Amino acid sequence: GASGWMWSASRAARVIRFFTFLRHFKGEWAGDPIQLQPFQQFIVGSIFGWIDPATGLRRFRQCYLEQPRGQGKSTVAAGVALWLAFFDKEPGAEVYTAATHRAQAKITWEAARQMVLRSSLKQSISVRVSNLHQMSTASKLEPLGADVNGLDGLRPSGVILDEIHAYRSSGLIDVMSTATGTRRQPLIFEITTAGVGRLGPCWDHHDYTDKVVRGV
């Protein structure tokens, strides 16, 4: 592949197929298995399908996803978070959902929690008040607020950053990105609707992503 990277269709398909073991818990599809739409399969496949052939580790460590409301961002993010926490073969995985407010951070986490409760995953994953935990791997999925104080002890292997258009500074993003340094193949997954104005880290990441897509 380009620059030595390799596309693994099987690695991408494995994570896409994982979603079918999860179930919707809201609206008209509540109770139905999650079938990712083609554009969602592209997102998930792009994250997990590109690897370093020498190490087998993922190529991408950061993903920026900007979509209007109602496009299933939280569903995709919750499934990705569950995979990173409990199926990524990362010893002692720490995956966090974060936002400017804890209530916002809990949206993706609550979606993941409901997915566990409605699937066979609940047989191996403990559903707690404050997190999801798997004793056999010492892994967890947990929501956070945006207070960067006291986060120095975290060693995240995955972070879902929700609605980054509301972030006034890059403080939380920087702290979490730096904290992933000890992990083999960490992922920072930013999800957001479009914001207003060009202040804050969201515009910077939007602009950078646009240039990457256009090959600038």
Segments (PLM) and residue ranges:
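Phosphate/NTP-binding elements of NTP-utilizing enzymes
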Residues: G1-V216
